[in-house]
């Protein structure tokens, strides 16, 4: 019973903390995007092997509101705030341990497929094995 109370209290504190964060909201062709990490900030976490990591963000990073990815979570997006291109690129990210499909990452504001690929890879260590490919997609494919 004590563990359950502690768990509920922890969830409540996480909810309060998360709701106090001031995320930037932008829109792409009418689709709302929440920017969790702006260009120039530092993103951090713990990888699947339990190792802490941190990464300076060279582009905005967030997610599309109300668009779920294949992993049933909001679809992640890297957004180049200085870019003028309307092209949409989709990265296939692999699980680094199993090398199987993990999730998609959308790249916005990049003019070429190579720019989008480099915009993704710059956020990962050299030799990153989580990159599974990139393709240009249509707005219709994105918004369905």
Question: Language-model segments: which ranges?
Answer:
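Sec-dependent signal peptide recognition
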Residues: 4-9
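Bacterial Sec-dependent signal peptides at the C-terminal "C-region" and cleavage site
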Residues: 13-20
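Hydrophobic N-terminal alpha-helices or hydrophobic patches in metabolic proteins across all domains
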Residues: 21-144
